[in-house]
């Protein structure tokens, strides 16, 4: 008896991708966007198959992602933002609702929503994760979207 293994790959990147980008903390988020674009392009996705949608902030992502997924125009959505902890509970509310909302959109629609939203304690951590010491989480989210499109095509 042989165990069957099913997994996504990057052999033939196909599909149409929406980058959902937050305007808040744009000094960080623009680097996430550039990382995601670079990754999609390096895997063969044409610029004609990428659309960038700007939303005010991460709290607004679930509704925007729901509309994008419901349109039927996209094979995956890559959410890119940065929620930086401050001195009030605001961070917890925004980060939690964004995370839960995006997961609900993905489950309800069957469209992968890759999570490239930084939830960090400081501006320094955000900068590290947007292209310096800790890599580029926008690039990683784009890779996740590519792999999920491939995987779902095999299931």
UniProtKB/Swiss-Prot annotation:
Pfam families: DMRL_synthase
Binding site for 5-amino-6-(D-ribitylamino)uracil: 24, 58-60, 82-84, 115
Pathway per the UniProt entry: Cofactor biosynthesis; riboflavin biosynthesis; riboflavin from 2-hydroxy-3-oxobutyl phosphate and 5-amino-6-(D-ribitylamino)uracil: step 1/2
Any one GO molecular function term: 6,7-dimethyl-8-ribityllumazine synthase activity
Active site: 90
EC annotation from Swiss-Prot or TrEMBL: 2.5.1.78
Binding site for (2S)-2-hydroxy-3-oxobutyl phosphate: 87-88, 129
Similarity-based family: Belongs to the DMRL synthase family.
Cross-referenced NCBIfam families: lumazine-synth (TIGR00114), PRK00061.1-4 (NF000812)
HAMAP family, per database record: Lumazine_synth
Subunit structure: Forms an icosahedral capsid composed of 60 subunits, arranged as a dodecamer of pentamers.
Protein name, as recorded: 6,7-dimethyl-8-ribityllumazine synthase
Species the sequence originates in: Teredinibacter turnerae (strain ATCC 39867 / T7901)
Gene name per UniProt: ribH
């Amino acid at each position: 008896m042989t165990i069957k293994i099913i997994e996504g790959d990057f052999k033939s990147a196909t599909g149409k991708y929406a980058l959902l980008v937050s305007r808040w903390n744009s000094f960080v988020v623009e680097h996430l966007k550039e990382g995601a674009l670079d990754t999609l392009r390096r895997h063969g996705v044409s610029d004609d198959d990428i659309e960038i949608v700007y939303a005010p902030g991460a709290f607004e992502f679930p509704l925007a992602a729901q509309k994008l997924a419901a349109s039927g125009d996209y094979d995956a959505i890559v959410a890119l933002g940065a929620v930086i902890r401050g001195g009030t509970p605001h961070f917890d509310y925004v980060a939690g609702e964004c995370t839960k909302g995006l997961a609900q959109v993905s489950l309800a629609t069957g469209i992968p929503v890759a999570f490239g939203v930084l939830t960090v304690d400081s501006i320094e951590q955000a900068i590290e994760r947007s292209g310096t010491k800790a890599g580029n989480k926008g690039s990683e989210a784009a890779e996740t979207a590519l792999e999920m499109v491939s995987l779902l095509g095999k299931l």
